[in-house]
């Protein structure tokens, strides 16, 4: 399952960093729990945006060509959504293990032409909102403002 993979990998890094930061700052246990939720949801949103950028990002700004998830056989969110929506070009490119460049191009074009990118952005925003909700239990401060800004930076990341 996509979310379980993301939770165990990318989101766990955000989760752990947020938890350790709250602990070292002397936060109350209930606030540490909220920080857990913040980090987990922010990490999920980050990975979803990263998956989107692998399709629509600019290679020079990303530092790598687009379509690497497809080439490497990684089940990135736009790929999963395209396959669920019945896109045969994406399904074939993903299933073959080592897609040719024409297959990658066709699959990426199909993903861009469909609704998958918008669906993935909507999902990423949902997790970003959940991260922000977790911060509302913290008293207003420049630190909370900074954590809120990080969420917005992740969502607005556009290469």
Model feature map: region roles:
Residues 1-159:
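All-alpha prenyltransferase/terpene-synthase fold signal
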């Amino acid at each position: 399952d996509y979310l379980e993979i993301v939770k165990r990998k990318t989101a766990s890094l955000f989760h752990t960093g947020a938890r350790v930061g709250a602990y070292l700052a002397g936060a109350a246990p209930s606030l540490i729990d909220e920080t857990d939720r913040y980090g987990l949801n922010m990490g999920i949103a980050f990975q979803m945006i990263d998956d989107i950028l692998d399709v629509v990002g600019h290679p020079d700004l990303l530092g790598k060509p687009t379509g690497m998830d497809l080439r490497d056989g990684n089940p990135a969110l736009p790929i999963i959504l395209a396959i669920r929506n019945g896109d045969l070009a994406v399904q074939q490119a993903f299933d073959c293990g080592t897609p040719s460049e024409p297959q990658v191009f066709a699959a990426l074009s199909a993903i861009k032409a469909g609704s998958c990118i918008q669906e993935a952005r909507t999902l990423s925003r949902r997790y970003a909102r959940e991260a922000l909700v977790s911060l509302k239990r913290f008293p207003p401060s420049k630190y909370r403002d900074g954590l809120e800004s990080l969420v917005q930076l992740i969502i607005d990341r556009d290469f």
